[in-house]
Amino acid sequence: MALLQISEPGLSAAPHQRRLAVGIDLGTTHSLVATVRSGEAQTLVDSDGRDLLPSVVHYRRDGHSVGWQARDNAARDPENTVSSVKRLMGRSLDDIQQRYPHLPYRFHASDNGLPLIQTPAGNLNPIQVSADILSALAARAEAALGGVPDGVVITVPAYFDDAQRQGTKDAARLAGLHVLRLLNEPTAAAIAYGLDSGKEGVIAIYDLGGGTFDISILRLSRGVFEVLATGGDSALGGDDFDHLLAEWLREQAGIHDRDDRQLDHALRAAAVKAKIALSSAESASVSIAGWQGDITREQFDSLIAPLVKRTLLSCRRTLKDAGLTPEEVLEVVMVGGSTRVPLVREQVGTFFGRTPLTSIDPDKVVAMGAAIQADILVGNKPDSDMLLLDVIPLSLGLETMGGLVEKIIPRNTTIPVARAQEFTTFKDGQSGMMIHVLQGEREMVADCRSLARFSLRGLPPLPAGGAHIRVTFQVDADGLLSVTAMEKSTGVEASIQVKPSYGLSDTEIATMITDSMLNAKEDVGARRLAEQKVEAARVLESLQSALVADAELLSNDEKGVIVAASEHLHTMMQGSDPVAIEAAIKTVDQQTQEFAARRMDASIRRALAGHSVDEV
């Protein structure tokens, strides 16, 4: 008899055959690909021995180039050379034009408002451009490993929203890659350092790359990586250092023409060269457009000091979220090429009161961590007991009556996670329910971010409160949110996967959290008022139905007293005093207790009509 060959999910049927896995750091400025060889993570290089691949694509009518060659074409053909495309991922055209007004590209809007970049190769969206970068990294990996990778882990900024994460997955699919999972960049760095150094305790991951800044506070203990809190700014990075320095050079050189894009690129290139030189020297010489001069490290520091201060403010907020002080942080890990700037290392060290860790190349550490995770996920390390816990940045919830927000999953909850809560109908015979999904920390819908709406229809026509709807929020390991609503008695179900069309910056997230703290007292008052108004409306709705059905159980005087109490409650509902509304509700309750008892007796008599005592 033939035997079925069964292997564990994710493992090769041949137990001694290693599967090919890579980690990709899809960066704003540069990208890398890494793998695990002989138990050690290492980056894969190109034919010239270079680890870094510039995240730049140059488009021609007959094709495109990626990386170093594309970057060299940027000065000659800036309109058709796309760089920092990561900043455009998941954003609308309006959003991009507001955030990045100086981009040299020619944009068009697609039918749904998403950006299309006009190139000789056609109109391309950011996902397609990212796919070209990923294809180049995949080709490098295939050449180095001698085969197509079985799986890949791709890193993304901690605050990428659902649309940006989904866009990254779509780009990988276009590039022919099998994505095992997306991994937050700071978390990838924690994996690399956790395995290499074996540290246990609280660690801060300070990640300042070309286009984004992330700060993550993690607790490492016996192989468990738990993200306690995250923060940052998705519109702040080394590119901004370059921009400030380029503007300084423009002023020094007396360059007033802002329409010459080749000159703009030359200014940016000179700024980058000077920045790199100032990381190891006290001054740097610059030659641009016939002007020659020097810039000192002190001058450069004064230019970028406000930006560095912004990163430290994010650090302070994130530590507060984690309930920690800088003194409780055991180590500070520096990630991203921009952390080579001496002022950054100095200021971060001063803030945390300790010298930051830089033993792993800050450009490579994220890709190496991703490679380690990929190696585990394809089954090359089945005995690994490492557990990775990410968190969601803002609370998720839904709208309830009165414009209130019911939080289902609080912010900084570890993911993946699923939470469910039961709700009911407000009116008699209600056959549908609108589910409004929200994100934020405030108490009222108007103060939170709307993520999605969907309808649950086909509810059984029961009295108010009779139908029971179970709403489940599920956030997967990649941070994508699915919401399902199901009526329990009928099994009627509706669901949605939340994919916002706009990116949410870390600054906006920090503002939302700060606003919730500043307005906490007012929000509690507003919630109490709204809750009392909802309860008052429910009481009046129920009373009106009772009067229509059983008014004959009351004398005219009794009915007059109840009507007067209900009218008083209706008047109080129009005001803004929750105490007065609550008192009016109690008055209605007191005046209707006898009526409720008579209705109960009448209901029992109707139920027993035509039945003998023995039958009962």
Curated annotation (Swiss-Prot):
Q: Which UniProt keywords apply?
A: ATP-binding, Chaperone, Nucleotide-binding
Q: Tell whether Repeat is among the UniProt keywords.
A: no
InterPro entries registered for this protein in UniProt: ATPase_NBD, Heat_shock_70_CS, HscA_NBD, HSP70_C_sf, HSP70_peptide-bd_sf, Hsp_70_fam, ISC_FeS_clus_asmbl_HscA
The molecular function terms in GO held by this entry are:
ATP binding; ATP hydrolysis activity; ATP-dependent protein folding chaperone; unfolded protein binding
Biological process annotations from GO: iron-sulfur cluster assembly
Query: What family does this belong to?
Result: Belongs to the heat shock protein 70 family.
Q: Which PANTHER family match?
A: HEAT SHOCK PROTEIN 70KDA
Q: What does this protein do?
A: Chaperone involved in the maturation of iron-sulfur cluster-containing proteins. Has a low intrinsic ATPase activity which is markedly stimulated by HscB. Involved in the maturation of IscU.
Protein name as catalogued = Chaperone protein HscA
* Organism name: Pectobacterium carotovorum subsp. carotovorum (strain PC1)
